[in-house]
Swiss-Prot record:
Protein encoded by which gene: argR
Family matches, as Gene3D superfamilies: 3.30.1360.40, Winged helix-like DNA-binding domain superfamily/Winged helix DNA-binding domain
One function term, GO molecular function aspect: arginine binding
Gene Ontology process terms (BP): L-arginine biosynthetic process; protein complex oligomerization; regulation of arginine biosynthetic process
Pathway in which this enzyme or protein is active: Amino-acid biosynthesis; L-arginine biosynthesis [regulation]
Main location: cytoplasm
Name listed for the protein in its UniProt record: Arginine repressor
Pfam families (UniProt xref): Arg_repressor, Arg_repressor_C
Cysteines engaged in disulfide bonds, as pairs: none
Family of the protein in this entry: Belongs to the ArgR family.
InterPro entries found in the cross-reference section: Arg_repress, Arg_repress_C, Arg_repress_C_sf, Arg_repress_DNA-bd, WH-like_DNA-bd_sf, WH_DNA-bd_sf
Length: 156
């Protein structure tokens, strides 16, 4: 088996194990992967993979501290469309407010800033999961709101 195919299988198995939310130590993850035929896996590799994929320790339904990859904390990949990170778009008399998945606001705000004044965007302010966007001169807040809806293929 090619090295990259083997690596993909390892990543797939690793993520599947974490979805089970029953592993409380890196040693348990190592053992489970070895049981699946990944003989060369060790604690150091598991530790790097946990960091790479943003795994966290949290309490499962049985109140045990376990490793998991929460969907909402997942790192956006090149295959995940940005529109999937936008949860809600609304506006008032002053600004358009965009709610995103946790951690995605700065990425989305950077995209909006890159479109600039020609698209009606004066600027953005982004937190972790919320963006304030204000219209450029000559555009109304409602114009900007509708343009952002179209950009992220949301319903009017």
């Amino acid at each position: 088996m090619r090295s990259s195919a083997k690596q993909e299988e390892l990543v797939k198995a690793f993520k599947a194990l974490l979805k089970e939310e029953k592993f409380s130590s890196q040693g348990e993850i190592v053992q489970a992967l070895q049981d699946q035929g990944f003989e060369n896996i060790n604690q150091s590799k598991v530790s790097r993979m946990l960091t790479k994929f943003g795994a966290v320790r949290t309490r499962n339904a049985k109140m045990e501290m376990v490793y998991c990859l929460p969907v909402e904390l997942g790192v956006p990949t090149t295959s995940s469309p940005l529109k999937n990170l936008v949860l809600d778009i609304d506006y008032n008399d002053a600004v358009v407010v965009i709610h995103t998945s946790p951690g995605a606001a700065q990425l989305i705000a950077r995209l909006l800033d890159s479109l600039g004044k020609a698209e009606g965007i004066l600027g953005t302010i982004a937190g972790d999961d919320t963006i304030f966007t204000t219209p450029a001169r000559g555009f109304t807040v409602k114009d900007l709101y509708e343009a952002i809806l179209v950009l992220f293929e949301q319903e009017l």
